Amino acid sequence: MGAVVAFAMSIDPTCAQSPSFAIYQDKADCQFCHGPDGDGRGDPRSPGKAPDLHKTALTREQLIEVIACGRPATEMPHFDKYAYEDKSCYGLSAAEVGKNMPPDPHSTPLTRREIEAVADYILAAFVGK
């Protein structure tokens, strides 16, 4: 089974059949806000509110942290179900974030591997393109 997962994760992440694409588009529903093309024009009620992923300067590690932890005081949800239980998110606890806590995801939380796959998809499909 591990070999199947390793093979699936090695598929070009920009391919519509890749697990990374499926997580971005469907499971995490990133496209709802960021758009299917990552341009920040997803939600028709708030066009352009989400960042254009083509223009991000975030590193892979920073993308992983943003996906896992969300963005305090914004609508960017956290996808790690344990976010803010300790200080692994921006060095902050839930008590320190308080009312600025990022919302829960619209979908189910993601595993660490799925969060990494979304970051890899964003880097391969959008950043600098």
Task: Please provide the spans of the model-predicted regions.
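Sequence/structural segment immediately N-terminal to covalent heme-attachment motifs in c-type
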Residues: Q17-D37
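Short, solvent-exposed loop/helix junctions and linker helices
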Residues: K27, A57, T108-R112
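Gly/Gly-Pro-rich "capping" loops immediately C-terminal to redox-active cysteine motifs
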Residues: G35-V97
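N-terminal export/targeting leaders of redox proteins
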Residues: M1-S18, V127-K129
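C-terminal capping alpha-helices of c-type cytochrome domains
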Residues: D86-K129
